[in-house]
């Protein structure tokens, strides 16, 4: 018996060549909803920590909206007036842009993107998310957000069944 050799017939090779693009497309489209679902759960967890009752009242540092954006962060992603941070639809759109920027920064720096690390960056900045010893308050926030995101994801899966 010979090990390590492959006997690929021309017919099998053609079938694999034909199927490969379809399999790749199936993989990519299956991964996209999972990534969007994780993003949704993470952002919803952040919202629940930041402003669970959707109050329009500014935070102690002038933060506004569901995600308690500071004006400088808001202006990184939109030219819309900062007051629109209290509009959940507008705030959600900006939150997605901020999430994607944080995700890209973490990936660029070689870090795995997880709900914990996104929340750590959201609360303490990218520097906190890549630091060896981030502030305990930021770690606590990130742990709470990651736990909430995991719970939201479990509930979403349970409803889907």
Where are these regions (language model features)?
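Bacterial N-terminal signal peptides that target proteins for export
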Residues: 3-20
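Sec/Tat signal peptide C-region and signal peptidase I cleavage site
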Residues: 32-36
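Short, functionally critical alpha-helical segments immediately adjacent to catalytic or ligand/cofactor-binding
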Residues: 38-54, 95-96, 118-126
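Bacterial N-terminal signal peptides
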Residues: 19-30
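N-terminal targeting signals for Sec/Tat export/insertion, comprising classic cleavable signal peptides
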Residues: 44-72
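Catalytic and substrate-binding regions of cell-wall glycan-acting enzymes that process beta-1,4-linked
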Residues: 113-161
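Extracytoplasmic
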Residues: 38-43, 61-64, 113-115
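Alpha-helical segment that forms one wall of the substrate-binding/catalytic cleft
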Residues: 71, 75-130
